């Protein structure tokens, strides 16, 4: 069957099987990413940020959507300020865009320093990639599958350092539940025996700005100074040695920490 959109394909038995594994990885990763703003590029009907603790979350796609937290925009022209986004999820965006480099540059622009990007993509070096060789019509086979190695190179050129990730979906891309059940024995051993051949990869990268020093809040610095001052005030250096003093500065002769002879 030929699917006219990626969303329709993800509702097929094979697409649902793949999306279930991608969502499981996202549900594990996004709760540990904090910030103020998160965006999801594409597939607006699927809430891939459902487990995120970031309150302000929006989806972005070129198509209009009736839901409230949706922005209609092109991926290479995001309507967000520079360095304003803490988390960006890209579910299979780069395979279906004419200029993936331009999209990545735009994401790098809107990401804050230490912001995270989660890239989901089809692995060309897998059984999914093999099927694409003889099936190039419809979604997702008409897309340009980009290898994980190349994605990492593109990200690193922009200062986005890969931090973690995994591959999944080692079964052949069967379109029916019956054949999927027969091949599910391949999933548990996939990471061990053919880890690079997963049908999809899921990659987390962090935006690094070299030469940048993170500045703690002013109240934090003030509290640290007060603690250091209070600790230093309890002791004073005298000629015979280091002695304990009370809050008023009087020497406490009942306990010597160290005596210098």
At which residue positions do the language-model features occur?
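A short acidic, Gly/Pro-enriched loop at the edge of an enzyme's catalytic core
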Residues: 76-88
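Conserved class I S-adenosyl-L-methionine
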Residues: 116-145
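Conserved catalytic loop of SAM-dependent methyltransferase domains
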Residues: 163-188, 196-198
């Amino acid at each position: 069957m030929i699917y006219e959109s990626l969303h329709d394909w993800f509702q097929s038995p094979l697409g649902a099987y793949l999306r279930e594994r991608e969502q499981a990885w996202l549900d594990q990763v996004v709760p540990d990413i904090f910030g103020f703003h998160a965006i999801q590029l594409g597939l607006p009907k699927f809430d891939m940020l459902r487990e995120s603790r970031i309150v302000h979350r929006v989806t972005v796609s070129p198509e209009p959507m009736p839901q409230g937290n949706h922005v209609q925009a092109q991926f290479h022209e995001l309507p967000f300020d520079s360095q304003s986004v803490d988390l960006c999820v890209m579910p299979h965006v780069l395979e279906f865009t004419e200029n993936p480099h331009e999209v990545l540059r735009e994401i790098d622009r809107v990401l804050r320093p230490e912001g995270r990007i989660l890239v989901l993509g089809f692995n060309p070096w897998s059984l999914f990639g093999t099927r694409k060789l003889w099936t190039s019509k419809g979604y997702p086979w008409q897309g340009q599958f980009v290898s994980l190695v190349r994605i990492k190179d593109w990200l690193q050129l922009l200062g986005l350092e890969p931090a973690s990730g995994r591959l999944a979906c080692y079964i052949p891309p069967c379109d029916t539940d019956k054949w999927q059940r027969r091949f599910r024995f391949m999933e548990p051993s996939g990471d061990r025996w053919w880890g690079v051949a997963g049908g999809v990869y899921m990659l987390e990268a962090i935006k690094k700005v070299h030469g940048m020093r993170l500045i703690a809040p002013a109240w934090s610095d003030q509290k640290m100074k007060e603690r250091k001052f209070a600790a230093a005030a309890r002791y004073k250096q005298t000629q015979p040695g280091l002695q304990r003093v009370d809050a008023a500065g009087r020497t406490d002769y009942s306990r010597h920490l160290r005596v210098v002879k």
